[in-house]
UniProtKB/Swiss-Prot annotation:
GO terms for molecular function: DNA binding. Keywords: DNA-binding, Plasmid, Repressor, Transcription, Transcription regulation. This is TrfB transcriptional repressor protein. The keyword Repressor applies. InterPro entries: Fimbrial_Adhesin_Reg (IPR053721), TrfB (IPR032428). Gene3D superfamilies: 1.10.10.2690. Pfam families: KORA. Transmembrane segments: none annotated. Residues 37-56 bind DNA. The lineage of its organism: Bacteria, Pseudomonadati, Pseudomonadota, Gammaproteobacteria, Enterobacterales. In conjunction with KorB, inhibits the transcription of kilA, trfA and korAB operons. In conjunction with KorC is responsible for the negative control of kilC and kilE operons. The keyword Transcription regulation applies.
């Protein structure tokens, strides 16, 4: 699935995000305009990883601002058996959200 945003979603995502103008231009080109990341790597002389990171920063900001109501994002370091359970909960929650759409 290609990650895409509308211009208004993009503007909401970058609101308050501390990134440079180049990052914003790259992310808009990829997420809003649908241009391939390779285009920016070539034209700006950047590595693919740098371009991917720019896009990821904006996408992650969008996801953080658009969690379903009643949901929270968590990061934790757990023993493997507990991490397995949490991953299972995450998969179940994703399925539940997909059926609501």
């Amino acid at each position: 699935m290609k990650k895409r945003l509308t211009e208004s979603q993009f503007q909401e995502a970058i609101q308050g995000l501390e990134v440079g103008q180049q990052t914003i231009e790259i992310a808009r080109g990829v997420l809003v305009d649908g241009k391939p990341q390779a285009t920016f790597a070539t034209s700006l002389g950047l590595t693919r990883g740098a371009v991917s990171q720019a896009v990821h920063r904006v996408w992650a900001a969008f996801e953080d601002k658009n969690l379903p109501e009643g949901y929270a994002r968590v990061t934790a370091v757990l023993p493997e058996h507990q991490a397995y359970i949490v991953r299972k909960w995450e998969a179940d929650a994703k399925k539940k959200q997909e059926t609501k759409r």
